[in-house]
From Swiss-Prot:
GO terms for cellular component: plasma membrane. The gene is ccmE. This is Cytochrome c-type biogenesis protein CcmE. Heme binds at residues 130, 134. It is found in: Cell inner membrane. Gene3D superfamilies: Nucleic acid-binding proteins.
Length: 160
């Protein structure tokens, strides 16, 4: 092999090795920031046909409904304990902080945190979900007419 071909081969190999190393480092950095989404039943019984359960200590997000009657607040701190459920199971969540305004029993919620035990999540963040018809209380009050009713229809049946 001639000297120019050898130099070109080494340059190509160096570029390929550099690209592989860069991709490997990027994937390693991203893997620590990935939080997989689970439902309570997937945490308890596994995901899909593989029945793969999240590992204890894994960062994840759990989404479901807040079980009515399950919210317990600590009077000495901001700690809140509640249960998130779906059709097939429920998991307990502990969160230390201010809950969102939309957080209510029977309402949808997504908790992001770490799986402590098989059925308990220590949440770092709690997001309240709502449907597309949500109206903030202040706007709803401003839009409603007297006695809590919407304004009457105007000309041609249009709402005022």
């Amino acid at each position: 092999m001639s000297a120019p071909r050898k130099t070109r081969l080494y340059a190509i190999l160096a570029v390929v090795c550099g690209a592989v190393l860069t991709i490997a480092l990027m994937l390693y950095a991203l893997s620590s920031n990935i939080d997989l989404f689970y439902t309570p039943s997937e945490i308890l019984y596994g995901k899909n046909e593989t029945q793969e359960k999240p590992a204890i200590g894994q960062r994840l997000r759990v989404g479901g409904m807040v079980m009515p009657g399950s919210v317990r607040r600590d009077s000495q701190s901001l700690e809140v304990r509640f249960t998130v459920y779906d059709a097939k199971g429920s998991v307990d969540v502990t969160y230390n902080g201010m809950l969102p305004d939309l957080f209510r029993e029977g309402q949808g919620v997504v908790a992001q945190g770490i799986l402590d035990t098989d059925d308990h999540i220590a949440a770092k963040e709690v997001l309240a979900r709502h449907d597309e018809n949500y109206t903030p209380p202040e706007i709803k009050a401003a839009m409603e007419g007297q006695n809590g009713h919407a304004p009457a229809a105007g000309p041609e049946g249009k709402r005022l």
